[in-house]
Amino acid sequence: MNRSSHREDFFQTTASLEESNRKAAKSRNQNGNPIKLPSKILAIIADPLHDGSVYVAESAGTARRVVLETGETAALFKGPTAPLTSLSLSPDGKLLFAGCWDKTVWSWDVHSKQPKRKYEGHSDFVKSVTCARVKGQDVLISGGADAKIIVFSIDSGERLYVLKGHLRGIQDLRIDPFSVEQDSSGIVLFSASSDREIRHSSIPPDTNDLSSSNPLIVHETSVYRLFFDADGDLWTASADKTVKCLARENDWTPNLVLEHPDFVRDVAVYEQGGWVVTACRDEEVRVWNRATGELFHTFSGHFEEVTGILLVGSTVVSISIDATIRQWSLRPADLQRAREEAQNKKNEEEQPKQESMLTEEEERELAELMEDDE
């Protein structure tokens, strides 16, 4: 009788052991050309100064610039001892900012990689950061688990505004791109929260009380991510297992709903191909037809929750709790090939195994006869 020599096995249920074994087996796959990092990856942003590179934030408290083609770490940003949740670059691209579990926003000089100013003011985890230029001044905007949004002067570190109104923690911040194009004197900031509300405010604000304006309530629970497409429509990803497209011209009314089997962590729109790409807690990256809302293909490779996605040219770059960065091509030929390969694999798995017409004893006798013939 086999007995486990692993002490932790005695404290796990059969289901949890099976899940651990499943993940261990799946972790060996090379789908998406995985780049393995030391710890869980919680955020990703583009590197505007280096094509083919991205910045990622890790649970170990480090941020790094990774070259996608080689997997090389081109720059490492250290200092925090708590997980980093979010990233942003200053408007001039010279400073990297990271929201941290230590309730502050860290910053580094991109070229020297040396830590710079820390921005303080939150009483709980910082969950999201973004940057903008407002009336000629560069500002850092942070959202925290304390439900506050703080606008800082990047140069001085001064807290310019503190916006309140959400009832629970901020999950994401997104600047309306149309507000940047139309009026250089200010911007419009959208915020998503665990209270299921999406709110928006002008920066500089007319009031520090976000609750004075009507929120958008289109989800049943937490909204994790916001994404503006080229038409200015707002895409939302939620813990209610849906992604929704809110039409700007129809007062932000949903005109498309994408149903998922689990929490949806991120969404992006690939304009050139007409695809919507989503990241889900069920470990999958999905590609949807934007016009019809139909699921076209599912990229499988991650073996833990997918925490974020980023479009780099015609490639989807995904990150995960499994500590890998993976890449998926959306070029028409590559996407069609991936879809056909996935369908062929599914057909093979569904093919019933033919049962032998022989009894176990007859099969044994046949095997012995074949050995004798040799």
Describe the residue ranges of each PLM region.
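Terminal intrinsically disordered, low-complexity extensions flanking WD-repeat/beta-propeller proteins
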Residues: 1-25, 294-298, 303-315, 319-374
